[in-house]
Amino acid sequence: INGAFTNSETKDNADTWDVAGFIQKRINEKEMESAYLRKPYDTLKVYNSALNMCKYYFKCDELAQKPNEKGKIKNKYRKPNSAAILAARPNLINGGIQYFNLDKNKEALKFFATYVESASYPMLADKELAKNDTLLPQIAYYATLAADRVGDKDAIIKYAPMALSDKDGGKFAMQLMADAYKAKGDTAAWIKSLEEGILKFPGNDYFFANLVDYYNSSNQASKAMEFADRMLANDPNNKLYLYVKAYLYHNMKEYDNAIEYYKKAIAADPEYAEAYSNVGLVYLMKAQDLSLIHI
């Protein structure tokens, strides 16, 4: 069958890919039969046959959707093949997890990515998996993690948005996506993802700290201050936001304002070591400036 994939007479024929998918389906069924009978079976063969079957049946469906010479679409494959893919999808998760745990992240990514992408296969459109599959955000997060392990920034950017609603991994997926944009040199997308991260995950300091640091280091202190004020309006006792506002005043040499906000940060967290250290530094700098005035 492999030769038929490249043969000019057969490679664009839906039957070719249907047969290829059926072969993988039979491999899968044979291994699962052994498992049911408590005989030795190859778990990776089960998982890889599920992956290949999905790939081949999707290609079959794509070709079968092309109109014939009369302009009509007669896709006899869709119903049975979509049912087979739906039944196989859980093994895409299992295969991805097994390869991920073996630190074979390139292979893991293929499984997780296929699971996520299958939710938008036209042949499964009636199932509305993007809305109904409650595991989708979690598996998109796994795909993002595997992509990060292999350094595939484009894959991170592709799968992370679907992971943002995952309860446990959403904020980290957002962080990886921001890092990926930064690594690719797309500053506009990086800044946008940091801003989105602040709004989606206000309890995560990463996004706010990186955004303020960017504004501050690029001589946009007023933008940083504006953002700090906006965040404090929503959470006036947040120690990080108070500290950042103090730090901005500190850099602007507005020492009295800096002292005020460092003290507010300390009031919010009496063990905030950085705030104690910096308020002491500001007092010292203020004293030095005053001594220079009197010389």
Regions found by a protein language model. Give the residues of each.
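Residue-level recognition of tetratricopeptide repeat
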Residues: 11-13, 122, 170, 204, ...
